[in-house]
Regions:
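Short, surface-exposed loop/turn segments at beta-strand-coil junctions that are enriched for proline
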Residues: 72, 150-157
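Bacterial N-terminal signal peptides
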Residues: 7-18
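Substrate-binding cleft of secreted/luminal carbohydrate-active enzymes
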Residues: 438-491
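Short, solvent-exposed loop/turn segments enriched in Ser/Thr/Gly
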Residues: 49, 60-66, 143-144, 156-163
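Aromatic-lined carbohydrate-binding surfaces of glycoside hydrolases
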Residues: 119, 126, 131-135, 149-150, ...
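Catalytic domains of carbohydrate-active enzymes that cleave complex glycans
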Residues: 307, 311-359, 364-381, 471-566
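Active-site clefts of carbohydrate-active enzymes
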Residues: 413-444
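Surface-exposed binding patches on compact interaction domains or structured appendages
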Residues: 24-49, 72-147
Length: 566
């Protein structure tokens, strides 16, 4: 290429950039969209536009405000700011966080689900992770600004006015005013709904996604940051990997246990506000990475003065010898720390087929060596053999498997036992779930199910079980590469390597708001049980019939807040 031709190309490129930076404000469109509606890149200007951008909330609640943005010309380096919201009489809300909604790839739709229960097109780009600004806004590609307003518990009730300001460099390109109506009702600080999203931060995960080894000081910083995100989303039950945290030591001719890492883990989550409860990891697993694999129990074995970690068959007599020592030491330590009252113990996830007798056997071991500690596990309410009914203390049945078993669950609840529920890769169809190609209202309503049916906890297995590139691959393969998971099932958070933390998602935000709804419904039940039940029954008619229209849901939300304010 000649020098003159090269210079021409460079000048043309510079002019194009300057033109983009100088794009007139009228080329950029903004409109508010209910935060329960997903904004897609192909959305035309005005899609799902809120006519009146006024948002209701309680005190001590986090409120999501979503603004869609689209431009006919690129806008590089876009930033957003939201000044403190103010009342005309002088009240102010200053705790405001601004993020942008990123897009991830969904390769295929959730199977066995009617088209009307899905959103978006697969394969395609779906909104989910919440990322920091700036944003290089491409031409004719819609993005969403996500504003989180944290309303103080002491905020005055009334209308607060705010605005979202969009800038390209130092130039203001758009402003979008909105109102926040704070009701005279307060989300309780006490977190009564027990909530767990299983997650892992073992050495493999921490090295792969964060570049730090487990138990290094950088790793403990990561753990603390993750704990804060968990607490911020009202997660209060923390899966605790016993075999990784509790370290065996040779003392004389015996194995003794060092609880220093276990203690630091628990205390880190307690300090962040995420414990709550300690959820002891499963004692039994399955071999071959298969759901039908034979049962195996990881143990520590002493041979030749050396400790090795060894998985043994369930019938091996060394298993109970190990558990007697390990659980006995754990029990003594929990008593010493005063943590027995906040501890649950898993035995085996989803015991099925020939496994329930083994569940009974090892539940008896747990009850013997951890006296007073409840066992809890995911179970199939449609198939509850006696071994599970009598030996699993806290039942966690799967949504979609207990429609016809509510009498069984009510009897269990009436007898004084806790019953939770869980979702995973199923249910699908017309049920609620937190999958990427499902509407966000399905996520929020999960915790209305908790209230509606007196189910006091919620469990999901997929907090952060990431693929190697979670932004590009949202569907891991499990069961020895035989099962493709639905999009979003395996994780609801994303790795944040730069900050040694995790990124939230719009699904995680909707989940928190559903948990806040649960607490408000529970509060209303102490004041007006008939109204609390009416609202819950209007929202959740059955497990497959529930409010699907965000406008109708917002009406119920307002009625809830107004009832509490009386």
């Amino acid at each position: 290429m000649s020098y003159s031709r090269f210079l021409t190309v460079i000048v043309a490129y510079a002019l194009s950039v300057m033109t983009a930076l100088a794009a007139p404000p009228e080329s950029l469109r903004t409109w508010f969209v209910d935060s329960l509606i997903k904004v897609f890149p192909a959305d035309a200007p005005g899609t799902h536009r809120l006519v009146t951008p006024e948002f209701w909330c309680a005190r001590n609640q986090q409120v999501s405000v979503q603004l869609a943005v689209r431009s006919v010309a690129p806008v590089p380096g876009m930033t957003v700011e939201v000044p403190p919201l103010e009342m005309r009489s002088g009240g102010k809300i200053a705790d405001v966080r601004v993020r942008r909604v990123g897009y991830v790839i969904v390769g295929s739709h959730t199977p066995d689900t009617p088209p009307e229960e899905l959103v978006g097109e697969a394969p395609g780009w779906y909104p989910d992770p919440l990322l920091d600004f700036p944003l290089d806004l491409e031409a004719r590609r819609t993005h969403a600004v996500w504003v989180t307003v944290r309303v103080p518990a002491e905020a005055r009730a009334g209308i607060y006015r705010g605005a979202i300001h969009l800038r390209a460099g130092n130039r203001l390109v758009a402003s979008a005013p909105f109102r926040l109506r704070v009701a005279a009702a307060t989300v309780p600080e006490q977190r009564s709904l027990k909530v767990t999203n299983w997650f892992g931060l073992d050495d493999k995960v921490s090295r792969q996604f964060y570049g730090v080894p487990a138990f290094s000081e950088e790793w403990w910083t990561l753990v603390e940051n993750v704990a804060r995100v968990m607490a911020d989303h009202r997660q209060n039950v923390i899966l605790t990997p016993l075999m990784e945290l509790i370290q065996p030591r040779v003392v004389g001719s015996e194995i003794r246990y060092d609880f220093a890492n276990f203690d630091r883990w628990v205390e880190t989550f307690k300090r962040a506000g995420a414990i709550g409860y300690i959820e002891g990891g499963h004692l039994l697993g399955r071999g071959g990475e298969s759901y039908e694999g034979s049962l195996e129990i990881p143990t520590f074995q002493l041979a030749g003065g050396q400790i090795r970690k060894e998985s043994l068959p369930a019938d091996d007599p060394r298993v109970e010898q190990f558990l007697a020592s390990f659980l006995g030491a754990l029990n003594a330590h929990l008593e010493e720390k005063g943590w027995k009252s906040i501890y649950f113990q898993h035995i085996l996830d989803e015991a099925h087929g020939p496994e329930p007798p083994y569940y009974k056997k090892f539940a008896e071991v747990v009850h013997r060596y951890l006296p007073g500690i409840p066992t809890m596990d995911a179970v199939d309410a449609a198939h509850m053999p006696e071994e599970l009914q009598e030996n699993c203390d806290i039942w966690v049945p799967q949504l979609g498997r207990f429609d016809d078993q509510m009498d069984l669950l009510r009897r269990r609840i009436d007898s004084g036992h806790e019953v939770w529920f869980y979702t995973c890769l199923v249910p699908n169809g017309r049920y609620l779930n937190r999958l990427l190609d499902y509407p966000l209202l399905k996520v929020r309503l999960l915790h209305w199910v908790n209230f509606r049916h007196n189910l006091v906890g919620f469990l999901h297995w997929g907090g952060n079980y990431w693929t190697p590139e979670p932004m590009k691959d949202t569907q891991p393969v499990i069961n020895a590469n035989t099962t493709l998971l639905p999009a979003g099932d395996a994780f609801i958070m994303y790795p944040d390597r730069a900050n040694k933390s995790v990124l939230s998602s719009i699904r995680f935000e909707a989940m928190r708001e559903g948990i806040e709804d649960y607490e408000l419904l529970r509060l209303l039940k102490t004041k007006n049980p008939a109204e609390a039940n009416r609202l819950a029954e209007a929202a959740i008619v059955s497990f497959t019939e529930y409010v699907r229209d965000p406008v109708a849901f917002r009406k119920l939300q307002r009625e809830l807040l107004e009832a509490l304010a009386k």
